[in-house]
């Protein structure tokens, strides 16, 4: 279900919209292990799983200035969302079916990231889809050879460090943003105009796999390491929350400046020139290449910066528009 509110005043120079929604999806398709016999194959796709989604979307539109020579428009959209995997168990043709309540869905591979238990993002029943389930690193320790390694905490207190999926791990955050922001601001003064688009995401984490790989001196001892890699002198490839960072960011996505040039020509009705910049600036505490992964800008890595992603490039352009 969903419930919404639309409100406007001053001839809609101030407009506000709000909507709350909740949905529960059942009979989700999922792959299950089944016995042979009874079944012809050991895998079966069945509609059993369930998931809930809820959120709030808010929109605000303001026209604070509006006259012959000057105009300003401000639009802001906020979206908060919460997702939960409810169940993967149920019945199929009278037979009880169940799947693991903890399943890895995002891992690290390749040079500098092949230490073994390198699963990072999981689907866990009762949690949002895509959470970081990681060992806790207490800091760096020194081994007998004088090299640093990640000092992992024994979370279950059994006296052993177990990095497997059901070992010494905990839910350290989620990969998808809880809150997203979008804004468009435009301003006109006589013949000149400026517009800017801003987006942002908050409430999520990013695993800096680039930092993990290029700080590992055992893989890249003489080249392709980060500036502080020799000083840290880390000889370790195992994942942990040591490289888990806050993923919040605000990005100035687009900026355009234009001018409408007055003409006295009968053959040309109007002439406009403009200059634009894409991906102008990003404000973030993230130390990797870009925090804009697993967002609507680059949606392919589910919160993992795995050293294979190129940063979003900045582009400059100019335009001329002529109307005859």
Predicted regions and their residues:
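Repeated loop/turn-to-beta-strand initiation elements of outer-membrane beta-barrel proteins
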Residues: 12-16, 56, 67-68, 191-194, ...
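Outer-membrane beta-barrel and related beta-rich outer-membrane complex signature
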Residues: 28-32, 70, 80-104, 204-228, ...
């Amino acid at each position: 279900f969903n419930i919404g509110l639309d409100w406007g005043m001053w001839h809609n120079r101030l407009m506000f919209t709000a909507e709350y929604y909740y949905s529960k999806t059942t009979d989700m398709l999922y792959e299950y292990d089944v016995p042979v016999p009874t079944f012809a194959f050991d895998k079966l796709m069945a509609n059993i799983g369930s998931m809930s989604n809820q959120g709030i979307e808010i929109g605000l539109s303001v026209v604070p200035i509006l006259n012959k020579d000057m105009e300003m428009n401000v639009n802001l959209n906020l979206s908060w969302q919460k997702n939960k995997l409810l169940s993967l168990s149920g019945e199929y043709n009278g037979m009880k079916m169940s799947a693991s309540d903890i399943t890895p869905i995002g891992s690290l591979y390749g040079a500098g990231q092949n230490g073994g238990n390198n699963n990072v993002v999981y689907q866990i029943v009762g949690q949002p889809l895509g959470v970081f389930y990681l060992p806790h690193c207490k800091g760096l320790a020194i081994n007998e050879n004088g090299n640093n390694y990640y000092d992992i905490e024994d979370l279950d207190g059994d006296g052993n460090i177990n990095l497997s999926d059901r070992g010494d791990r905990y839910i350290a955050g989620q990969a998808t943003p809880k809150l997203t922001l979008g804004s468009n601001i435009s301003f006109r003064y006589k013949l000149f105009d400026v517009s800017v688009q801003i987006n942002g995401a908050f409430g999520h984490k990013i695993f800096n796999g680039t930092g993990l790989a290029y700080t590992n001196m055992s893989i890249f001892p003489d080249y392709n390491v980060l500036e502080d890699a020799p000083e840290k002198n880390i000889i370790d490839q195992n994942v942990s929350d040591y490289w888990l960072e806050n993923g919040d960011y605000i990005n100035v996505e687009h900026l355009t400046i234009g001018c409408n040039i007055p003409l006295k020509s009968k053959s040309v009705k109007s002439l406009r020139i403009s200059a634009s910049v894409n991906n102008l600036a990003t404000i973030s505490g993230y130390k990797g290449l870009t925090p804009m992964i697993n967002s609507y800008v680059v949606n392919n890595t589910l919160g993992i910066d795995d050293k294979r992603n190129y940063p979003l490039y900045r582009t400059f352009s100019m335009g001329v528009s002529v109307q005859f």
